[in-house]
From Swiss-Prot:
A Gene Ontology molecular function term of the record: phosphoenolpyruvate carboxylase activity
Catalytic reaction(s) noted: oxaloacetate + phosphate = phosphoenolpyruvate + hydrogencarbonate
SUPFAM superfamilies given in the database record: Phosphoenolpyruvate/pyruvate domain
An individual GO BP term: tricarboxylic acid cycle
Family matches, as Pfam families: PEPcase
Protein name: Phosphoenolpyruvate carboxylase
PANTHER family (UniProt xref): PHOSPHOENOLPYRUVATE CARBOXYLASE
Function: Forms oxaloacetate, a four-carbon dicarboxylic acid source for the tricarboxylic acid cycle.
Length: 878
């Protein structure tokens, strides 16, 4: 890499050298030499040396079974260590200017206050921001939690290395710690022996909060307060919470039979338990800190003029938190303890009121400096996390709710709900929603699947509203899908109005989303229920799998525009929930860019976004990194609200309509209409083998017997990223752009790319995907794994990809992909010589296991390690 990345290169070199020493100690010198030889051959092969490529393939094919696992592990761990070094580089004091952008919030405040936006308007926007980041597990984080903790410790060592004041002895101790950690990593199994349970996934999410976000939230808000005070002279309120966190881990039952009402209850208890435990740590520290005697009259009266009034209040809180933890421990162990609710932290105010009193007393007694330390941090954590830590969303497929009502109407002799038309369904549902008598008879014994849905809504009814987020209905298409859930909640005795959120996923459903919501607003009962606000979820993964990325992106944009219009006309506040994945094929990409490319008026200070699997670690895994990510989200939502992008010109819309139409035709011509496509996909990728990898808790398919359409978006993307063709992230888009160029529209496309954030984002995402893709490697998989009679399809796909790259370079008037983002390009180029050998070995091992039907345990484990290694190198799974 170039000199501007010298510190990154140095860290990668140090970690690589220690890993090499570890391998030499565990294996031997000849084995390490072989790894180095293959690495050098991979580099030469990248530069077009065919002899080096042949030598590398010969060496890989000759690896004995006992060397397969350590070989795959060596390259896998190098890539993980390179990721750590790169992640650390973005927060390092030696970070170069191309990588470390200035603080986005500070920049935005400067731009806004230089005459463009009124100060009061800016402050009002900041204080009413409602950004909800929803942690999900299903793409799935491929690294084990035990390894992630070790990776964090490696980062601590890298940070220590930057301290210029270290003595020689301290440097040696730090280097020894680094060697110990890398040895621990080497000797730890990277592949789980069993799939994680939904509870395991929820615990992983909680560990991210404990390890990083718990510290990052007060750090970020302190930084934000300083920036605002510096520019406006005003302080932010102590309870400001521009960003909060929700979760799907333990609440998302769509296609996951392992998420039951019992599991959801356990996760809710674990969330509360973690919050209570972390607040207890804060209170223990505050007992030590707040030893002062001076207080305001309110606090002195409450504590009988105690000499240590702050400690009196804090000791009582400390005991309540300990009792709460004991109570939740008993519940998690399966007991039903009887308790006096007054002795527990049961509501947010049980913590907020006493802490606010202490804060007020300190500030009124001239001790603001003390008040604005740990006490303010705790108040801000409370405003962000509450006493439940994460608000748990519930998600279920629309058909599962319909099945409940259908089974019930058949039992009651009313006919079959599933066979009624939409008008009949709505009439029945509204009649029951408006009525007072219960619909479900006491003596009814429903089927197991229906009983599980009923158990879930009853669980919701028993919870505090602040423990839960939204009820998301996947594959929603009609108003009756929403009304059905509302009726089930009513029947369960739910006293609080829960947000019921339709998720529009397919191309057709996205196109009909606005008319569905408009029909709901036309119902008086529903208008009364929603109380002036509506949340709608936009699905990115399934729409892209259904129609390709270009057509899906335009459908998502158009759906949002229409939803904004419908809600504005009805005078209802719209919150859009973006179900993005980590990868481009699932709507992923830089969050800041993505938010600023939304239609004008669609953000308006409110947004929900899923943060998925491995992206949670990349964005929030370290406190300083998390502060950066929180600042990016805050600045993007403020900018999209106060300085929205321009409305697209009519000719841009027309061009996008043509691009969407051409791209979906090209995409479906392959994925749906090409008779050999499924056979090619199964042969050319490790899709079948991925099903054996113990990743997330959720099955890879919605239906066991289904084809591509039943395959979840995540394994669909994961499989294509393994053989480096990256097909879902570009298929259809390049062909549509080429057709536009052939029509003489290149000048128009350039104008769109330069002036329209939505289109510029689409093109830059395409560039990134093309840069990560490796058609020559995909061809090697084909040679090893695909029957000769299907090779024509691979040739056609690679030809389409070449066309796409050519037209994107013409459009951007660039000589090379990602020339305007050198950091990203360097990052890809750094990894390639380490990913390539894993890809070549993976193809070899796939061929072996498929030929022999039952491979040795060494071969199977090595194959799993290559899958994990390629995922680490590509920095995405699904």
């Amino acid at each position: 890499m170039t000199d501007m990345y010298a510190s990154l290169r140095s860290n990668v070199g140090t970690l690589g050298q220690i890993l090499g020493d570890t391998i030499r100690t565990h294996m031997d010198e000849p084995f390490l030499d072989k790894i180095e030889q293959i690495r050098h051959l991979a580099k030469s092969s990248r530069q077009g040396n065919d002899t080096a490529r042949e030598q590398m393939l010969t060496l890989l094919a000759a690896l004995p079974d006992e060397e397969l696992v350590p070989f795959a592990k060596a390259f896998n761990q190098f890539l993980n260590l390179a990721n750590i070094a790169e992640q650390f580089h973005t927060i390092s004091r030696n970070c170069d200017e191309l990588v470390c952008v200035p603080d986005p919030v500070d920049q935005l405040l400067g731009r806004m206050l230089n005459g463009r936006i009124d100060q009061d308007k800016m402050l009002e926007c900041l204080q009413t921001l409602d950004i909800d980041l929803v942690l999900t597990a299903h793409p799935t984080e491929i690294s084990r939690r035990t390894l992630i903790q070790k990776y964090s410790a490696v980062v601590d060592c890298l940070a220590t290395m930057e301290n210029p004041q270290l003595t020689e002895r301290e440097k040696k101790q730090n280097h020894l710690r680094l060697r110990q950690l890398i040895a621990q990593i080497w000797h730890t199994n990277e592949i789980r022996h069993e799939r994680p349970t939904p509870v395991d996934e929820a615990r992983w999410g909680l560990s991210t909060i404990e390890a990083s976000l718990w510290q990052a939230i007060p750090d970020f808000l302190r930084q934000l307060n300083e920036q605002v005070e510096e520019r406006t002279g005003k302080q932010l309120p102590s309870d400001i919470a521009p960003i909060r966190f929700s979760s799907w881990m333990g609440g998302d039952r769509d296609g996951n039979p392992f998420v039951t009402a019992k599991v959801t209850q356990e996760v809710l208890d674990r969330n509360r338990h973690t919050a209570a435990r972390l607040y207890l740590k804060d209170v223990v520290l505050l007992v030590n800190e707040l030893s002062m005697e001076e207080a305001n009259e309110e606090l002195l009266a409450l504590t009988d003029n105690s000499h240590e009034p702050y400690r009196v209040v804090l000791r009582e809180l400390r005991q309540k938190l300990r009792d709460t933890i004991d109570y939740l421990n008993a519940r998690l162990e399966g007991h039903s303890p009887e308790v006096d609710l007054d002795s527990l932290i049961w509501h947010e105010d049980d913590l907020k009121q006493p802490l606010t009193l202490l804060y007020r007393s300190l500030t009124e007694s001239g001790m603001s400096l003390i008040a604005n330390g740990l006490l303010l941090d705790m108040l801000r954590r409370l405003a962000c996390f509450g006493i439940h830590m994460l608000r748990l969303d519930i998600r279920q497929d629309a058909q599962r709710h319909s099945d409940v009502i259908a089974e019930l109407t058949r039992y009651l002799g009313l006919g079959d709900f599933d066979h009624w038309d939409e008008h009949e369904k709505q009439a029945f549902l509204l009649r029951e929603l408006s009525g007072k008598r219960p619909l479900i008879p006491h003596n009814w014994e429903p089927s197991a699947e229906v009983a599980e849905v009923i158990s879930t809504v009853r669980l919701i009814a028993s919870q505090s509203p602040k423990a839960l987020g939204s009820y998301v209905i996947s594959m929603a298409s009609q108003p009756s899908d929403v009304l059905t859930v509302l009726l089930l909640l009513k029947e369960a005795g739910c006293q609080h109005p829960m947000r019921v959120v339709p998720l529009f996923e397919t191309l057709e459903d996205l196109n009909n989303a606005a008319s569905c919501i408009s029909a709901l607003f036309a119902i008086d009962w529903y208008r009364g229920y929603c109380k002036g606000s509506q949340e709608v979820m936009i699905g990115y993964s399934d729409s892209a799998k259904d129609a390709g990325v270009m057509a899906a992106a335009w459908a998502q944009y158009s759906a949002q525009e229409k939803l904004v219009k419908v809600c504005n006309q009805a005078d209802i506040k719209l919150t859009l929930f973006h179900g993005r994945g980590g990868t481009i094929g699932r709507g992923g990409g830089p969050a800041h860019k993505a938010i600023l490319s939304q239609p004008p008026g669609s953000v308006d200070g409110r947004i929900r976004v899923t943060e998925q699997g491995e992206m949670i670690r990349f964005k929030f895994g370290l406190p300083k990194l998390a502060v950066q990510s929180l600042a990016l989200y805050t600045s993007a939502v403020m900018e999209a609200t106060l300085l929205p992008p321009p409305e697209p010109k009519p000719e841009w819309r027309e061009a996008m309509e043509r691009l969407a139409s051409d791209s979906v035709t090209a995409y479906r011509a392959i994925v749906r209409e090409e008779p050999d496509f499924v056979a090619y996909f199964r042969a050319a990728t490790p899709e079948v083998e991925l099903g054996k990898l113990p990743l997330g808790s959720r099955p890879a398919k919605r239906r066991v017997d289904g084809g591509i359409e039943s395959l979840r978006a995540i394994p669909w993307i994961f499989a294509w990223s393994q053989n480096r063709l990256m097909l879902p992230a570009w298929l259809g888009a390049g062909e549509a752009l080429q057709q536009a160029a052939d029509r003489g529209e290149l000048t128009l496309l350039r104008e769109m790319e330069q002036q329209w954030p939505f289109f510029e984002t689409r093109i830059s995402m395409l560039e990134m995907v093309y840069a990560k893709a490796e058609p020559n490697l995909a061809k090697y998989y084909e040679t090893c794994l695909v029957p000769q009679e299907l090779h024509h399809l691979g040739e056609a796909l690679r030809s389409r990809m070449a066309t796409g790259i050519k037209v994107v370079l013409e459009l951007t008037q660039s000589d090379a992909l990602m020339s305007h983002t050198p950091w990203n390009r360097e990052s890809v180029e750094l990894r390639n010589p380490y990913i390539d050998p894993l890809n070549f070995l993976q193809a070899e091992l796939l061929a072996r296991t498929r030929k022999e039907q039952a491979g040795s345990s060494n071969v199977e484990l090595a194959l799993m390690l290559t899958i994990a290694g390629v995922a680490a190198g590509m920095r995405n799974t699904g």
